[in-house]
């Protein structure tokens, strides 16, 4: 396939699941006005049941998102097929098909951001587990807390802000890495702490999954 068009549209996640569903339907409608569309593929945060095409669990960052039935709503409204998958699973599958995991028998993909998401690709297929919640590694219990509460960008920002005595809103990952390169000791300490926890968490996952390739993604990994 060839990418023909690309757009960025604010999610406004704080407005909740019904808003996101309605926004998605508006986007689909806008494309149908211009051209024929063979189908819709949705990559979404949260725990996704790809067979039912719905979100069955989501964190507090997106209110009222659990239960959102994308597949049913899109197919009923527009009479075209719709598939939905977890966003990290989509990223991992893309890496396995045409990226750094191409040709690997077992690929582990983690995305580091607000939390930590995980995906396991086995022989080119997403491993969903019994109830579509496999590789939710952010909730992995470590000695000092949950994995994503220690090694995510959110955790890094919180640590650095507290170390400086600043409100969290004054910091972000980009600023932390920039100031670390300029010699800010507290920023360097925060990054070292994050990398240490990230390494420990990765090691634990690798003990279980034994991946051939490990891929790290997310905003601060660029």
Pin down the residues of each PLM region.
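Short secondary-structure boundary segments
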Residues: 44, 112, 218-219
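Glycine-rich phosphate-binding loops at beta-strand->alpha-helix junctions
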Residues: 48, 205, 211-222
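Short histidine/acidic/glycine/proline-rich micro-motifs that form metal-
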Residues: 10-15, 61-62, 146-147, 220-222
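Active-site charged/polar residues at nucleotide-handling catalytic sites that mediate phosphoryl
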Residues: 35, 209
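Glycine-rich phosphate-binding loop and adjoining helix at the ATP-binding site
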Residues: 12-13, 17-25, 29, 36-40, ...
